[in-house]
Amino acid sequence: MNPTPLESRFDTYAAYRQAVADTVMLARRELVVFDPDLRETGLESPAMEQALRAFLSAGRDNRVRIVVHRPDEVERACPRLMAVQRLHGHGLSFRQSPEDLRHLSDCFLLADGRHAVIRFHADHARGKLLIEQPDEVSGWRRRFEDLWGLSVPAIASTTLGL
């Protein structure tokens, strides 16, 4: 059963992180994320680590794709997320945005092409949550696919050594 369509606004980081958590819990097949460094998403919390592990374990075709501007910052600041990637490297992929697009300052997380959390600017908490809004989410999805195609692989799931 699909959730009731909803559009709501938020203007605090706590409300933003709750919207991210709610959207992750709605995901059944795919999560896509565009964020400069994931710092404010809450994806690094213990609850989100558990939710992402459960999501990726729920189906072998489930995927999380993330585009960031600063993957080195993500590696350093997100050990829980890195642990999820080590365990589920097949399902969790990172890419780095090209240098000429690092001025992009909005952030978004999309689930299954139907649900979205959108922050209008990375420096501010203000944004909106879209539940069961595939028509509005489709433009954000196209934007993500364009970014994904222009970005380069980053943050390997394994460490190579001698």
Label every model-predicted segment.
Residues 1-39:
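Interdomain hinge/linker segments and adjacent boundary elements that couple functional modules
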Residues 10, 120-162:
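Signature of lipid phosphatidyltransferase scaffolds
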Residues 14, 54-55, 63-64, 145, ...:
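Terminal leader/tail segments of proteins
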Residues 16-17, 48, 77, 140:
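Amphipathic coiled-coil/heptad-repeat helices and related helical stalk/stem segments
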Residues 23-88:
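Primarily the HKD phosphodiesterase
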Residues 31, 93-140:
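HKD (HxKxxxxD) catalytic microenvironment of the phospholipase D
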Residues 35, 63, 68, 92, ...:
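Long, hydrophobic, amphipathic alpha-helical segments used as structural scaffolds
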